[in-house]
Amino acid sequence: MLDREGFRPNVGIILLNARNEVFWGKRLREHSWQFPQGGIKYGETPMQAMYRELHEETGLHPEHVKIIGRTRDWLRYEVPDKFIKREVRGHYRGQKQIWFLLRMVGRDCDICLRATDHPEFDAWRWNEYWVPLDAVIEFKRDVYQLALTELSRFLRRPAQRADKPQGPRPSSRYPRVIGTQSQQTLTIVDTSVVCSEIEVEASTLDEMPPRVIVGK
């Protein structure tokens, strides 16, 4: 289903935990990371499509999340010809998306990447809100920046620690790169184990599959 300009209606999902970290999924058998997203079927509202895609890609149900915001209008990106099937070239241009910001009220173990027979992700982690755009496929980066920036107004500020010195806070706007230099410990879900966590170590976000250190 395309609009007159050749864009397919679509929804994107930014899923937050209680610490304002976002669900960050590694695409199946690829080295790129992204948010859950998917097309709106004929007769669906954007909200209905969002809940369907949420379950298909993360295993979560409506009772596991709370909607706290959405973009005011469609955000568009064009797909390069090399990623478009030959039979639809000249008609299909890309995606137009409504983005939803969700707060997870369930538990991490409610997330299951094998909720369907065709999973989108083979690993996931919680990442800082301002995700590293260099881990995202290039033609989606501008839309990610627009969606994150527009929806950031809905974020609640985490409580300030009493012993933390007050002072100017660094800007949280792009450009910003997270976790590309220093070694860090990531928590992902291996889809071979339903709703269980393993601790892994990687020197960069795109070093996948990571080396397993110890099971939790």
Curated annotation (Swiss-Prot):
Record bears the keyword tRNA processing: no
Required co-factors: a divalent metal cation
Keywords associated with the record: Hydrolase
GO molecular function terms listed in the Swiss-Prot or TrEMBL record: pyrophosphatase activity
Domain annotation Nudix hydrolase: ranges: 6-149
Pfam families (UniProt xref): NUDIX (PF00293)
Database matches in InterPro entries: Nudix_hydrolase (IPR020476), NUDIX_hydrolase-like_dom_sf (IPR015797), NUDIX_hydrolase_CS (IPR020084), NUDIX_hydrolase_dom (IPR000086), RppH (IPR022927)
Motif placement: Nudix box: 38-59
PROSITE patterns according to UniProt: NUDIX (PS51462), NUDIX_BOX (PS00893)
Top-rank taxon: Bacteria
EC number per UniProt: 3.6.1.-
Keyword Nuclease: no
Class of enzymatic activity (EC top level): hydrolase
Coiled coil: none
Annotated function: Accelerates the degradation of transcripts by removing pyrophosphate from the 5'-end of triphosphorylated RNA, leading to a more labile monophosphorylated state that can stimulate subsequent ribonuclease cleavage.
Family recorded in the similarity comment: Belongs to the Nudix hydrolase family. RppH subfamily.
Name this polypeptide is given: RNA pyrophosphohydrolase
Gene field: rppH
